[in-house]
């Protein structure tokens, strides 16, 4: 591990339309090759779709979806006496958010709708209702942690 001082976390400015930091972080995660305007168009397009199709507040749907997808526990490999054990550990809050956003992005990419905005809208709506690819991923991680609960005494 490096022995230098800890690098400070960078402040993320809230997004221009909703004034929400989480939306801005999600846009930054979605962005490819520094094209923020494209990422903005995708996210705001998805929010528009949620508004028109569901008639719900898109920001609320986004927040509920994120909270539903956030993992509580995950497994980490730990070597003990020549054997590797999958040890369940609690996920710290910043990593929870990052994983939830990453899983939402990946699940949206795998969907079959025409545009990324439509895919993202579908995934966010489904995640808010407790189903979809991102929720499946979260449940899979929780299942792994539950299956390896016997090794929880090998805490890090």
Swiss-Prot record:
InterPro entries: Ribosomal_uS7, Ribosomal_uS7_bac/org-type, Ribosomal_uS7_CS, Ribosomal_uS7_dom, Ribosomal_uS7_dom_sf
Stated role: One of the primary rRNA binding proteins, it binds directly to 16S rRNA where it nucleates assembly of the head domain of the 30S subunit. Is located at the subunit interface close to the decoding center, probably blocks exit of the E-site tRNA.
GO molecular function annotations of the record: rRNA binding; structural constituent of ribosome; tRNA binding
Disulphides: none
Name listed for the protein in its UniProt record: Small ribosomal subunit protein uS7
SUBUNIT field: Part of the 30S ribosomal subunit. Contacts proteins S9 and S11.
SUPFAM superfamilies per record: Ribosomal protein S7 (SSF47973)
Similarity-based family: Belongs to the universal ribosomal protein uS7 family.
Keywords linked to the UniProt accession: Ribonucleoprotein, Ribosomal protein, RNA-binding, rRNA-binding, tRNA-binding
Top-level taxon in the UniProt lineage: Bacteria
Assigned GO CC terms: small ribosomal subunit
Biological processes annotated in GO: translation
Keyword Amino-acid biosynthesis: no
């Amino acid at each position: 591990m490096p022995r230098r001082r800890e690098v400070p976390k960078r402040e993320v400015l809230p997004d221009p339309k909703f004034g929400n930091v989480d939306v801005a972080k999600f846009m930054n995660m979605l962005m490819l090759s520094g094209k923020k305007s494209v990422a903005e168009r995708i996210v705001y397009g998805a929010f528009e779709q949620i508004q028109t199709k569901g008639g719900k507040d898109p920001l609320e749907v986004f927040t509920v979806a994120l909270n539903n997808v956030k993992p509580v526990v995950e497994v980490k490999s730990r070597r003990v006496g020549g054997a590797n054990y999958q040890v369940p550990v609690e996920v710290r809050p910043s990593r929870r958010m990052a994983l939830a956003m990453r899983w939402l992005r990946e699940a949206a990419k795998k969907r079959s709708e025409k545009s990324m905005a439509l895919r993202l809208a579908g995934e966010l709506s489904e995640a808010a209702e407790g189903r979809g690819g991102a929720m499946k991923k979260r449940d899979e991680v929780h299942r792994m942690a539950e299956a390896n609960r016997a090794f929880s005494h090998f805490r890090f």
